[in-house]
Amino acid sequence: MNPSGTIGVLEQNGEEHLATPILGPSVHSDNPQERIQARRLRIAARQEARRREALGEYLDGKKESEEEQSKSYKQKEESRLKLTKLLLCGTELVTNIQVAADVREIHRRVEEEETKRQRLEKLENEVKTSQDKFDEITAKWEEGRRKRIPQELWEMLNSQQVHCAELIEDKNKLANELQQELKIKDDQYVKDLKKQSEDITLILERMEEQVKNVMKNFRQELIHIEKAFESERQELLSSNKKKWERALQAHNAKELEYLTNRMKKVEDYEKQLNKQRVWDCEEYNTIKIKLEQDVQILEQQLQQMKATYQLNQEKLEYNFQVLKKRDEESTVIKSQQKRKLNRLHDVVNNLRTKYTKQIRQFQDDNQSLTSDYKRLVTQFKDLQKALRHFIIIDEEKFREIWLMNEAEAKELAQRAFDVDRIIHSQHLGLPWNMPDLWFLNNVGPISLQQQKSVTQILEELLLQTEDEATEAAMSEDEDYMDLPNQISAKTTTKVLMLLCDESGFLIESKLLSLLHPLEKSECYLLRLDAIFSALAIEDEDDLYKLVNFFLRYRAHRLSSAQASSSIHSNVERTSLMSALERLSLMSQTDKGSMVSKSDQEPTEQEDEQEGDNASLSSRELEEQEDLSSPRFIHPNDVLKILEAFVTGLKKPKDAQPVLKLKKETRDNSKDTEYWESLAAVIPFFKQNLWDALYKALEKYYLVLTERAKLLMENESLEQQNAEMQSLLQQYLQAKVNTELQIPPTQGFRMPSK
């Protein structure tokens, strides 16, 4: 067990211990080795404190008083402490080998650093002495060129040969020492491998021994814990059995007491029932007397009602006679109205014949216009197809030229990178990394076109729709999808509130349940947000288009109502149907067909519509100013207006007029930057480095050429020396020398070959 209080005490003691001044190494010292040693000591102290805490030991050597605990709990604590100590000892026994190996490795590395330093110093000294000797030899070669006497030249060559032999001997000696040191290191490495294998074998043996020991101790402690639990279980069984017997005795006593109390309550309830029975009989008698009196009163009222019924019957007979006379008068009026209705039927038939003729004429015109429209659409599609073909060809040519130039530029850049890599790795001995440039991964022309949403594309197409043949004629009649010039905030608020009240079906039921506790303004805002999401209204232009559509719809309904009021009341239904038909045609068909229909209206309706169109603007202004009047927009028309608006906004391509396609131009703002970046893959500082390296290599080439010349001169001198030695040998071996008293061989020493 590791109580939290004990941990807090240990941490506090550890902090106080760290806070006290330490005479040993400090972490604030300027020496890095001293700081490292101080940190190691502090970590070791903390680990020792945690080990003591895990073993149940205390820093102050005192043990807190423990509460009374069960045998099983005490046995578990004893087993835990014993096993913890066993594990710590086993771990320490196993890790001692690793610690010793680490110490040996640390000493080996320190010795290796020292020997390496000494070796480097020795090599540096050797290089300096060798360079001095080599400089001395090269200087004597310059002196030898000035000499012309063979004997002096021979002495100089002997001395140079001795110096060269000494230099080579020093180099060979150094090489032998290094080889001997390498051999010693190989032997030491083999010994270290053997030692490591022995350590690993010892660790494995100790680990197996510790595992067996731990398993054995775990089994023993488990047996002790089971025995403690078994004894505690027997004690609990005996104590619980005694408690159960005492509880049964108390329960029996309570049941006996409950039985006596129940008998007393039964007697009391019987007495109360007898009293209640007597009281009910008395109350029944009083109610019976009261009801008999009520029956007598009701019989008297029935006699009065019969008298009233007789009087009312006489009045009804009189009224029947009066109504009969009025019915006769109504039959006469009905016959007159029938004759009038027949005349009106004749008028309706005439109007229907005119209507059928106009419909036929409109259909013929529509067919002719449709054929012209289809012909123009096919021509336009052919033109678009040719245009797309040429655009694709131009783009392919542009892309091919781009890719060709790009491949050539990237090949040159790769060659430059290869040169830079060779310079860094072979000449400078520096690591070289491939530069991560954004333009090297690009393939093909750079595209910076911004993606547009579907709603933006629809708005652009709707705003760019033009029809030069019908633009002037229909600009004032049915431009429902254009933005209004100005709409007051009050008008917009009224329209939005009406839309919010009548379009609740577009809102989810879960959202409606969440909106009930909110205020009215917040509720309206959230409802309108959900409705706009359902209708795909995303910006301010779409909102004002919707408001303008509502206002134009109301103005059109007023004009159609005034036109229909000029005709007789019996053809009101026909005019209403025609107005609705015109509204649907205006929201679903193109503008050209509406021009032909409006031009071919009957002359009688043209006069009425001219008057209506003249007063249309004034009525719109009045209705926009007085939107609170009940004649603004009927709530039943809101769904129709929404349907027409959505149909007009999301109309299919075949029902829309021919749209002008906007030519998409490619953004070439980054082309210059891209090609300039490809041309400048090697920065200016690297070019300066190349120039400096080129100059150094030129100097190095001059030195090599001079060295080659010197080698050729040396070879020629060696050849001359060999010829002179052969001549001298012939001279010394001549027979004339044997006849002389002092032969020439006694005057000088022959050089050894």
Swiss-Prot record:
Keyword Cytoplasm among UniProt keywords: yes
Keyword NADP listed: no
Signal sequence extent: none
Pfam families the UniProt entry points to: NYD-SP28, NYD-SP28_assoc
Keywords carried by this UniProt record: Cell projection, Cilium, Coiled coil, Cytoplasm, Cytoskeleton, Flagellum
Superkingdom as given in the UniProt entry: Eukaryota
UniProt cross-references to InterPro entries, sorted A to Z: DRC1/2_N, DRC1/DRC2, DRC1_C
Region (Disordered): 1-33, 55-76, 587-628
Bias (Polar residues): 587-597
Main location: cytoplasm
Subcellular compartments: Cytoplasm, Cytoskeleton, Cilium axoneme; Cytoplasm, Cytoskeleton, Flagellum axoneme
Residue ranges that the Swiss-Prot or TrEMBL entry lists as coiled coil: 100-388, 703-739
Cysteine pairings via disulfide bonds: none
GO cellular-component term (any): cilium
GO biological process: one example: cilium organization
Comp. bias regions, Acidic residues: 601-611
Disruption of the gene: reported phenotype: Knockout mice on a C57BL/6 background experience pre-puberal death, usually before postnatal day 12, and exhibit signs of growth retardation and hydrocephaly. Mutant mice on C57BL/6 x ICR background can survive to adulthood, are infertile, and have reduced sperm counts with short or absent flagella.
Similarity field: Belongs to the DRC1 family.
Biological role: Component of the nexin-dynein regulatory complex (N-DRC) a key regulator of ciliary/flagellar motility which maintains the alignment and integrity of the distal axoneme and regulates microtubule sliding in motile axonemes. Plays a critical role in the assembly of N-DRC and also stabilizes the assembly of multiple inner dynein arms and radial spokes. Coassembles with CCDC65/DRC2 to form a central scaffold needed for assembly of the N-DRC and its attachment to the outer doublet microtubules.
Subunit annotation: Component of the nexin-dynein regulatory complex (N-DRC). Interacts with CCDC65/DRC2, DRC3, GAS8/DRC4 and TCTE1/DRC5.
Name this polypeptide is given: Dynein regulatory complex protein 1
Organism, as annotated: Mus musculus
Gene: Drc1
